[in-house]
Structure formats: C-alpha cells, structure tokens
Amino acid sequence: CDELTKITKKFDGNIVASIESRGFIFAGTIARDLGLPFVLARKPGKLPNETYKKSFDLEYGSTSIEIQKNTQIKPNDKIVIVDDLVATGGTAIACAELLSENFNVKNSNILILSIINLEDLGGRKLIQEKGFLIETLVDY
C-alpha cells in the first residue's frame, strides 16, 4: 500500500473512494494513512442512506453501483478511486461518472488508481478518453 499512498499524495487527493469490494482493502489503508475521508461505491441496496446510482454494462451483463448522497464531496475535491483491477474500465468509469455527474467534480480531478491493469482489454485507453486520470502498479 505504500506505493498507492505515495501516488495519492502526489496527486494531492483529498478523498479516497473505492469500488466494492477488494478495493476496500487498499483504499481503507490509504485513507487511514493520509487521514482522508473514505467513500464507498457499492452494489445496490448495500448502503444505509439515500444514494445516487449508475448503471453500466459488463462483458457478461449489466449492473449498477451506488454512492450515498450525504457524502461530503465538493466540486473542487480531488478524488482517488482505488480498485484492485482494471479490465475493460467499465466499473471504474461508472464510479468516476457517478462522482462527476452527481457531485460536479471535474473529470481531471478524478484519479483511478489500480493495482493491476489488463492492457489488452483496453480499460486504460477508455478511461483516458473519458477525461479521467489513471495510474496502475502493474500492467499485464
């Protein structure tokens, strides 16, 4: 997690978000180490309060993720979305769009930070085409 924390600090992120569920392991540590708020993006019905929802397609169907409306995100925040793996980029983009569309955060203020990127599946390119930033530790 040290390298992920360094990247978050270099980006000057002030909020750490994560996509259910393996990303929580890394994101929670980063948020704790840097003393930052931690925002959860979860499957529908898993969060206790009213949520914003974003549906998206996967290679094997469709699904959606939610973030609580009462999250204290402001338009000028710099948000780091932590996930374990980027494949096609669909889940990461859905989370980033959920934040940008509902909290008015600029795409350039959202960094998707992943442990692994599966290069042949094109997720990095699609994320960049949408105007979001991406950093990965390992590219396969």
Name what the model sees in each region.
Residues 1-82, 86-140:
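PRPP-associated nucleotide enzymes
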